[in-house]
Amino acid sequence: MSDVVLSAVPTPFAADGSLDLAGARRLFGFVAGVVDGLFVTGTTGEFPALDDDERLSLIETALSVAGPDRVIAHIGAPDAYRAARLAAAAVSLGATRIAAITPFYLAPSPTEVASYYLRIREAAPSAGLYAYIFPERTGVTVTPSQFCELADEVGLAGAKFSGAAALNVAACATARPSLRIFSGDDSDLAATLRAAGAGIISARSSAFPEVFAGLSAALRAAGAGKAPDASVTAAARQADVTAIAALGSSIGLVKEALRLRGFGPMGARMPVGFPDPATAARVGELVKSLAPAD
């Protein structure tokens, strides 16, 4: 796989909270046309507020517009029973890569975390399975040594480390170089790559895919020595990423930017931190300056 920038795409909802599947198809197609792939029905996709049929409909939509090799379908749940059923269903739809956040709400032991992933592996043996570690959202901390043990026992293909866990990307990627370790921190792609990470799974790239794809391309060209001005371009794109990151990391900010880019109301079911008027104005300024006019 050569994916470096995967977008953790939000789920479009109508103003009344109903799922906007047609809007999802349009959004997924747009983002997939710019970045390397999609991470669907994850945290940014408000997965706790989706029923199983809705999650599978969104996964099927992503697979149809981006292709199986460019989609990681998140099927994580609080319990192994539901996650395993979703995993099997996603694979039946054509998914070749699945991810699961650690079980949450009731605090699991490391043994229970491993059991959860083994149940998913048994339900979907042909799929590449990625652990999703996000302690701030789950209350589950997985140390680098625990992750390596988990990866070996379950046969993981990789992982996404978000929040405080993103600090463990270097340790885990170095200890298990055959795995694809992604960071959920999209503020410094170059640092992730220097730490031996595979790349980023980025919420903000859903709204500004051109910026993140441009940064990735410039870093690749600079590393290969193919373009004398690539380092200058990379620095400029990183400055754009820094400006985007300065707004904050809420899902509501991403949805506001997409709304301004013409992707419908981009409503939400969960409290996603929609911006206040002053912040919304700053989002609008960035959209005008960084997003190509359609």
What are the residue ranges of the model-derived segments?
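Helix N-cap/beta->alpha junction signal
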Residues: 79, 185-186, 276
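C-terminal alpha-helical cap/extension of soluble enzyme domains
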Residues: 5-11, 27-35, 194-197, 204-294
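Short secondary-structure capping/turn micro-motifs that flank functional sites
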Residues: 47-48, 106-107, 167, 190, ...
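Alpha-helix C-cap/termination motif
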Residues: 34, 65-68, 93, 123, ...
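Catalytic alpha/beta core domains of metabolic enzymes, predominantly
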Residues: 123-125, 134-246
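Short secondary-structure transition/capping segments
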Residues: 51-53, 110-113, 171-172, 194, ...
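Active-site beta->alpha loop and helix N-cap motifs at the rims of alpha/beta catalytic domains
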Residues: 1-141
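A general structural signal for well-ordered alpha-helical segments in protein cores
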Residues: 24, 55, 59, 83, ...
